Each structure stands twice: as structure tokens, then as C-alpha cells.
UniProtKB/Swiss-Prot annotation:
Domain notes: The N-terminal domain interacts with the head of the 30S subunit; the C-terminal domain interacts with the body and contacts protein S4. The interaction surface between S4 and S5 is involved in control of translational fidelity.
Gene name in the database record: rps5
Entry GO CC: cytosolic small ribosomal subunit
Family: Belongs to the universal ribosomal protein uS5 family.
Key words, A-Z: Ribonucleoprotein, Ribosomal protein, RNA-binding, rRNA-binding
Any coiled-coil regions, as ranges: none
Protein task: With S4 and S12 plays an important role in translational accuracy.
Protein name (database record): Small ribosomal subunit protein uS5
GO molecular function, one term: structural constituent of ribosome
The protein's assembly and partners: Part of the 30S ribosomal subunit. Contacts protein S4.
């Protein structure tokens, strides 16, 4: 099976297409075997049964149109007994723009390897997002925004997502916009606290807020 996936790479938020060959994939987990054998046919079944995704190929099969965006690449230094070692750190977000999103971080000595690791982690971190029309100024009942006010936090960064009426758009910073767009959110107001210049914490705060829409008990 060959799956085409849109991948965003340098410059940030630009797009290219890669071809993923899944015919050579040998599942290592029971869930992976169930997916490859066709016993599980949708990503919804995985979360409905509280399964844990441990292989990114599961996501590649069940969400073949998954889009990916490179949010940031930094050169970081790590002190070892042999001296300082340089590595690249990449932050990647993935989503199908229809209710699923994930964020991951990867480190490696080469940029491409760091991006690949971050993409793999983002797929493993994929979560469903509950969408709706939660603004009292809008009554369209379409899943264009968040259904209620929800918050997310990572490090010093905290973000609040506020339902907005249709047509408002994404009132947020570039990093937040990318994650929200991949999740399928089209209209939302945001409030932030902390150092939003830290891309990883900012992206993870948005991710955690979106994750909370699904796990929040109404």
C-alpha cells in the first residue's frame, strides 16, 4: 500500500508531498496487526475502545490524507563528557483538518532526521478534537469552532480557546493558527499567558487545549 501525505517543511508552513510505502510494514503490536488485517477500519474505533497508538503506520493507514506542518527548527547544544554536542530540534504538527491533531518534537544531528522523529511522535500523539458552534452570537450548529471555553497549558504558556461566530477566523498567533487549522477549527478567539515565543510550549499548550475538548466531561 502506498499512501501520499502532504508534509510541510522549510520554509515554515510550506508544503511538499511524500510517498509512504506501507507494504513492507510488519506490525509489532496487537493494534497494528488488527489494523493491517482490516479488523479496525477507522481511527474513531481506536479512541472509542481506548486503544493506545504505538506505531505511526497505524495513522498512515487510517488517515491517509494527514497533513503535516513544520512549526520550528532550532540548533540546540547538549553538554556531554566529551564536550558540547550540537543537535537540531524540530517541532511538527499533524492533522486531517477534520477533528484530529497531534504535535511532536524530535532531536537529531541532521535536520531531516529531527523532522522525521518529530513527525513520528506527532502521529503517536494524535488525539480527537471535539468541535462545535459554542458562541452565543452564532447558532449555525456547524463544527467550525470549539463547543465551549477550554484551556491548555505547557511550561509557562497557557492558552484559552473561546468559541467564535462563523466568519471570525482564527484570532491567534501563527503557531496556534497552524495547530488549530490542522485540527479543523476555523473560527476561535484566544487568550494567552506566558512566553509564547517558545514554539514548543506554545504548540503543546494549544494541543492540550484541543485534547481537553474531547476528554472534558459535559
Amino acid at each position: 500500500m502506498r499512501v501520499k501525505a502532504k508534509i510541510f517543511i522549510r520554509p515554515l508552513f510550506a508544503t511538499y508531498v511524500s510517498v509512504i510505502d506501507l507494504s513492507l510494514w510488519e506490525p509489532r503490536t496487537e493494534l497494528g496487526r488488527m489494523v493491517k488485517e482490516g479488523k479496525i477500519r477507522t481511527i474513531d474505533e481506536i479512541f472509542a475502545n481506548n486503544y493506545i497508538i504505538k506505531e505511526p503506520e497505524i495513522v498512515d493507514i487510517l488517515l491517509p490524507g494527514l497533513k503535516q506542518e513544520l512549526l520550528n527548527v532550532n540548533l540546540v547544544q547538549r553538554q556531554t563528557h566529551a564536550g558540547e554536542r550540537n543537535q537540531f530540534q524540530a517541532v511538527v504538527a499533524v492533522g486531517n483538518e477534520d477533528g484530529y491533531v497531534g504535535v511532536g518534537i524530535g532531536k537529531a544531528r541532521q535536520v531531516r532526521q529531527a523532522i522525521e522523529k518529530a513527525t513520528r511522535e506527532a502521529k503517536l500523539n494524535l488525539v480527537p478534537v471535539r468541535r462545535g458552534c459554542g458562541s452565543w452570537k452564532c447558532s449555525c450548529d456547524e463544527p467550525h469552532s470549539v463547543p465551549f471555553v477550554v484551556r491548555g497549558k505547557s511550561g509557562s504558556v497557557e492558552i484559552t480557546l473561546i468559541p467564535a461566530p462563523k466568519g471570525v477566523g482564527l484570532v491567534a498567533g501563527d503557531v496556534a493558527k497552524a495547530v488549530l487549522r490542522l485540527a479543523g477549527i476555523k473560527d476561535v478567539w484566544t487568550k494567552t499567558r506566558g512566553d509564547t515565543r517558545t514554539t514548543l510550549n506554545f504548540a503543546m499548550a494549544v494541543y492540550n487545549a484541543l485534547r481537553n475538548t474531547y476528554y472534558f466531561k459535559i
